[in-house]
């Protein structure tokens, strides 16, 4: 079960609980949008795969950016390089001489921690500074947006979902090393 399904079911549960739809209607909606949800999850997976591919190239070309990224994340208490079995500065230098950057599993660890750091920092922003509703709406399939617009706006995890969408959009496109000076 993906986070998309959980967040959708949470919203629909609130609709059932309030009496706006029945359990049968909820189940019908879930059946109708199953393919859309799967496609959305797969799109996110593709974007994360692209992030890792681009970060792999970036880490080969500029190992010092990845080193700086890991140091910043460590300084912020977000990353424990030793616990995550990530290379030391010396190991990165040796790899760079050999034309090697971080390996994809290592990049996935750095990307996850970078995303969590960006996400936490976005949550600290005052409400209204970011167009949260736009990102929240984009998270849900079109059929849900048109039928349950009010429920989306009232989603109990609306801000968190919106900041997750924004975090993924930024980091997946700009890379794990991009947003660390914020």
Predicted segment positions?
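Ligand/cofactor-recognition surfaces for anionic moieties
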Residues: 1-182
């Amino acid at each position: 079960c993906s986070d998309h399904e959980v967040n959708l079911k949470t919203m629909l549960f609130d609709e059932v609980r309030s009496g706006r739809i029945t359990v049968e209607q909820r189940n019908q909606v879930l059946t109708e949008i199953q393919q859309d949800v799967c496609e959305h999850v797969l799109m996110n997976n593709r974007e994360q795969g692209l992030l890792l591919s681009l970060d792999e190239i970036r880490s080969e070309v500029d190992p010092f950016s990845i080193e700086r990224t890991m140091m910043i994340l460590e300084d912020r208490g977000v990353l424990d390089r030793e616990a995550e079995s990530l290379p030391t500065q010396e190991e990165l230098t040796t790899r760079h001489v050999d034309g090697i950057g971080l390996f994809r599993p290592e990049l996935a660890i750095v990307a996850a921690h970078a995303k969590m750091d960006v996400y936490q920092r976005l949550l600290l922003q005052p409400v209204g500074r970011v167009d949260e509703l736009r990102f929240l709406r984009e998270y849900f399939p079109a059929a849900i947006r048109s039928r349950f617009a009010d429920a989306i706006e009232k989603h109990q995890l609306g801000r968190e979902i919106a900041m997750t969408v924004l975090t993924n959009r930024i980091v997946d496109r700009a890379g794990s090393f991009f947003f660390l000076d914020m």
